[in-house]
Curated annotation (Swiss-Prot):
Reaction(s) this enzyme catalyzes, per UniProt: L-histidine = trans-urocanate + NH4(+)
Gene3D superfamilies: Fumarase/aspartase (Central domain), Fumarase/aspartase (N-terminal domain)
Name used for this protein in its record: Histidine ammonia-lyase
UniProt keyword list: Cytoplasm, Histidine metabolism, Lyase
Annotated NCBIfam families: hutH, PRK09367.1
GO cellular component: cytoplasm
Length: 513
């Protein structure tokens, strides 16, 4: 297995996307090791001292005022992990579990959490040998960190709970043993350091972000195809228009669409003598809408890159100041806001895509395309209900885009009285991205058919390659057939990057985190 060396505080989203997509093993840079050891020494000293230090020699949450004897330190940390294993729901998918573990490594690697090097080593070894905890997906309110799901991660390190090794679920004790690893016995504060933090919410949000960027790239491709299918004008994509406004995403979106459509015979065929003065907004305003969505994704990416490198534990060991201080870095409000931004972008990319689908199937608006893109309308319904399905998915995503960060509820006997709801705010992005892939897949079906109806005129070379990639597994719709497999396959081609992969990569390189 390939290994990636990460520097806490300097890790990029590109590196984290590699981890998520490729399942790489991860090791912290050697430069992080001295700080980790030094903070652990400070915690060990505090555990043997008389002064109360939260989570080191006290209880937790509302029980923080109860002093714990030094002899009970290990029991305190083990009890914390086991009692907090209260997650419910479907297990988190393995690639996101791996990302959670890597984010926890990065947080602990900042040298402010007080865990011993052997705790770091076990997480690294579990990643390298493919031991992944089974983590239920529900149960976090996003403050004090993602306690319940991270407890399930930590439990696997103790040999408790369940884990997956070599594709098979088993007890964590068995998984560790089969990988040649031993459970860790936690020292002072280590249990708290493992479960306190925003790593689950952040991993959910990052997975959603990576998929949303992939969808944004696909949307620029499908929208370019749609523009040619309805013989739309490229004049609204002129660079001068967008530089006058100045938004980076808008400028990039317009430039990308122009490049994708460059050389289209269809476009050249109606530069003169076209009675239409302006195209509908779903064509003309693509850069303004999709570009604004890309800007939102970039903003969310910046927040999540900072959070991925953050120490989000409590209390934190301030080695330079020789202090151990309670704070609130575990509160995932920045992640909740980022998740809401991503959700809005996903919903809007899908909304304008659906309007282009509706445009193409409507003979009153499609500039001479046949009704519902079938060569024999009446006897055949063509893509009539595919458009209806896209409308259903669009509306569902609008509902799912309702902000989660505006919600809060007090927990833990009102000690933790304001929470972020970041975890489920970020978890919904998986469902939203799946819906968006379906919408864009339907647009690809419609736009490809529309362009094919313009023969013998051809679209641009890049867009011809996209249609060819689609037609390898989804034949043209000559007459009605059982369509569900076509929709599933077109969504897969979007989701797995096959359609975008047919295009020279430099044309879409700007649309990344």
């Amino acid at each position: 297995m390939s290994e990636l060396i990460l520097i806490p505080g300097e890790t990029t989203l590109a590196q984290l996307e590699q981890v998520w997509r490729q399942g790489l093993a991860v090791r912290l840079a050697d430069s992080a090791r001295p700080g980790i050891a030094e903070s652990a020494a400070r915690i060990a000293a505090a555990a043997n001292g008389e002064a109360p230090v939260y989570g080191v020699n006290t209880g937790f949450g509302k029980l923080a005022s109860i002093k714990i004897a030094a002899r009970d330190t290990a029991t305190l940390q083990r009890n914390l992990i086991l009692s907090h294993c209260c997650g419910v729901g479907e297990p988190v998918e393995p690639e996101t579990v791996r990302l959670i573990m890597v984010l926890k490594l990065l947080s602990l690697g900042r040298g402010a959490s007080g865990v011993r090097p052997e705790v770091i080593q076990l997480i690294e070894d579990m990643l390298a040998r493919g031991v992944l905890p089974v983590i239920p997906s529900q149960g976090s309110v996003g403050a004090s960190g993602d306690l319940a799901p991270l407890a399930h991660m930590a439990a696997a390190m103790l040999g408790e709970g369940r884990a997956v090794h070599e594709g098979r679920e088993m007890s964590s004790a068995e998984a560790l043993a089969s990988a040649g690893l031993k459970p860790v016995v936690l020292a002072a504060k280590e249990g708290l350091a493992l479960i306190n933090g925003t790593q689950v919410s952040t991993a959910f949000a990052l997975a959603g972000l990576f998929e949303a960027f992939a969808s944004a790239r696909a949307a620029l491709v499908t929208s370019s195809l749609s523009t040619d299918a309805i013989m739309g004008s490229t004049a609204p994509f002129l660079d001068e228009i967008h530089t006058l406004r100045g938004h980076r995403g808008q400028i990039v979106a317009a430039r990308t669409i122009r490049a994708l459509m460059d050389g289209s015979e269809i476009r050249e065929s109606h530069r003169e003598g076209d009675s239409r003065v302006q195209d509908p907004y779903c064509i003309r305003c693509q850069p303004q809408v999709t570009g604004a969505c890309i800007d939102l994704l970039w903003q969310a990416a910046r927040t999540l890159e900072i959070e991925s490198n953050a120490a989000t534990d409590n209390p934190l060991v301030l080695v330079g100041a020789d202090r151990i201080v309670s704070g609130g870095n575990f509160h995932a409000e920045p992640v909740a806001f980022a998740a809401d931004q991503i959700a809005l972008a996903i919903a809007e990319i899908g909304a304008i895509s659906q309007r282009r689908i509706a445009l193409m199937v409507d003979p009153a608006l499609s500039h001479d395309l046949p009704p519902f893109l079938t060569p024999d309308p009446g006897l055949n319904s063509g893509l009539m209900i595919a458009e209806v399905t896209s409308a259903a998915l669009m509306s569902e995503n609008k509902h799912l885009a309702t902000p989660c960060s505006t919600d809060s509820t007090p927990t833990s006997a009102n000690q933790e009285d304001h929470v972020s709801m970041a975890a489920h705010g970020a978890r919904r992005l998986k469902r939203m991205n799946a819906n968006l892939a379906q919408i864009l897949g339907i647009e690809a079906l419609c736009a490809s058919a529309g362009v094919e109806f313009r023969a013998p005129l051809a679209t641009s070379a890049p867009l011809q390659a996209v249609i060819a990639a689609l037609r390898q597994t989804v034949p043209a719709l000559e007459q009605d057939r059982y369509l569900a497999p076509d929709l599933a396959e077109s969504a897969r081609l979007v989701r797995e990057g096959v359609l975008v992969g047919a295009i020279p990569s430099h044309l879409l390189d700007e649309v990344r985190p």
